[in-house]
Design a protein with these regions (language model features):
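Residues within well-ordered beta-strands of beta-sheet-rich folds
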Residues: 49-53, 194, 230-232, 302-306
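Generic detection of long, well-ordered alpha-helical segments
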Residues: 59, 201, 205, 239-247, ...
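Polysaccharide-binding surfaces and accessory modules of carbohydrate-active proteins
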Residues: 3-160
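Short alpha-helical segments and helix-capping/turn motifs at coil-helix boundaries
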Residues: 6-7, 134-135, 176-179, 249-251, ...
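Beta-strand-rich recognition/accessory modules
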Residues: 113-227
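Aromatic- and carboxylate-enriched substrate-binding clefts and catalytic-loop regions
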Residues: 259-436
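Short, solvent-exposed loop/edge-beta patches enriched in aromatic
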Residues: 44-46, 55-58, 144, 255-261, ...
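An acidic-aromatic substrate-binding cleft motif
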Residues: 208-264, 268-273
Length: 436
């Protein structure tokens, strides 16, 4: 890496200004202190953290922490526009990721899906040279390959996101946010941001590898080096799958074991009576899940099952019996931020609620006892999208509430069961799932 580029990147990092969002307004150190909030910046190893102490004597809403740098004429990072590339990481597997250049606009989204594709959809801009990323953002000099990557290496409590603005001379604005989503910050309480780190490397790939290694170490990532090999019902039968379809394929794979040495048979969406009532099958699966798992095992395969654990359909027994377990609106009734087939509305289980955590532990413990060794958890991002809703725990962020629910799922399913996360915010899954 050239001394010039390295010194410019060091200037960017050292010039970051720390801010805190209190009741929907951003404050620097001095303005925060004047209002009774002690904001401090520190290093955690090679990472940066911000801490706020509420000394105001009143409860407030904590929007998050921000590191910011700006300077027109490429004042943040001077790399000529024709050489500068921005790598954008997506929030989930269904969010776009890739490289943008000066003159481009951000990736386009279906407006109806935007709230499931971005942590902060209200900040999306289709203007040229305005870009947003989740988890990590990188700046590359495509002439030399040299790269600076900014990424959050912890992610259990808050969502990490980024934005930047380019001009013809380079990066004019850069922002990294550790999002607290309006969680309660009580008088006398302290909250610490997630850890923000920077990685300079001779290539984007090298920077990504260093970031991933550090992120995985800090979050105790689970390591499985042999990917599971199996058959999934979704990609042929979709939601029309029947019990006899599963049995037919089990027999076929048993007869062709040498040609197709699979380990798992996964039943996907289509068996459940309603979202939320996962142990009760519809009429297409007359013998039930326990019986089916036993039939799969007798044939020499491991049973696997699809669920969307945070989603609860409006016609489910779970919603009728426990509406208070859902994320609540201002009238203390369930929010319905999503929809399902045949016009059914979907409420979202509140992962911050201890009763929901107990429900998850019991559900996944039962599935394991019934013989399922693998679960695919789908539509997981819905567990973080609450709109105007509020959590049982007012101090929980969206990220923390989601992870609490996922921790309970892991506890119930056991350390040796394989959990696949699907359409989930990557950061909050690290350390709890085996694949994504």
């Amino acid at each position: 890496m050239t001394q010039h580029i390295e010194s410019e990147w060091r200037r960017l990092v050292d010039g970051l200004v720390g801010e805190v969002n209190i009741d929907d307004r951003w404050y620097g150190v001095d303005d925060a202190r004047a209002r009774g909030f002690a904001l401090t910046a520190a290093l955690a190893g090679d990472a940066r953290v911000l801490t706020v102490i509420n000394q105001s004597g009143r409860d407030v809403r904590l929007g998050g922490f921000r590191w910011r740098a700006s300077g027109p004429g490429g004042g943040v990072l001077p790399v000529p526009a024709e050489r500068l590339r921005v790598y954008i990481e997506g929030w989930t597997m269904a969010s776009p990721c890739g490289v943008r250049k000066y003159g481009d606009s951000d990736f386009r989204y279906n407006p109806e899906y935007l709230k499931f594709a971005m942590c902060a959809p209200e900040e999306y801009s289709g203007e040229p040279n305005h870009f947003h990323a989740e988890h990590a953002m990188a700046f590359c000099d495509c002439g030399s390959g040299e790269t600076l990557l900014a990424g959050f290496i912890t992610s259990a409590r808050q969502f990490g996101r980024f934005s930047c603005v380019l001009d013809a001379q380079g990066v004019a604005e850069f922002c990294a946010i550790s999002d607290c989503s309006g969680a309660l910050l009580g008088a006398g309480e302290t909250v610490v941001s997630e850890e923000l780190a920077f990685f300079a490397a001779p290539s984007l790939y090298a920077a990504q590898c260093r970031f991933a290694e550090c992120w995985g170490a800090r979050m105790h990532a689970r390591k499985r080096f042999a990917p599971p090999l199996g058959w999934c019902s979704w990609y042929y039968y979709f939601a029309k799958v029947r019990e006899e379809d599963i049995l037919e394929n089990v027999r076929w794979f048993a007869e062709h074991r040498e040609e197709f040495p699979i380990e798992y048979i996964q039943l996907d969406d289509g068996y459940q009576r309603a979202l939320g009532d996962w142990l009760v099958c519809n009429e297409k699966f007359s013998h039930g899940l326990r019986w089916l798992a036993a039939a799969i095992k007798r044939a020499g395969f491991k049973p696997a099952l699809w669920l969307a654990p945070f989603q609860v359909e409006d016609n489910s027994e779970l919603l009728r019996e426990h509406p208070d377990w859902m994320i609540q609106n201002a009238q203390n009734a369930p929010c319905f931020p999503a929809s399902w087939r045949e016009g059914h509305k979907v409420a979202i289980l509140d992962g911050s609620n201890p009763a929901v955590q107990d429900c998850f532990r019991s559900l996944f413990k039962t599935l394991r006892e019934w013989g399922f060794d693998y679960v695919k958890l789908d539509f997981m991002v819905q567990g973080t999208v609450c709109g105007e809703g509020h959590f049982w725990d007012p101090r929980a962020t969206r990220a923390a509430a989601f992870r609490k629910g996922l921790e309970a799922i892991r506890e119930g399913f056991g350390e040796d069961g394989f959990i696949l996360g699907c359409t989930a915010p990557f950061g909050q899954m690290v350390g709890l799932v085996d694949g994504e």
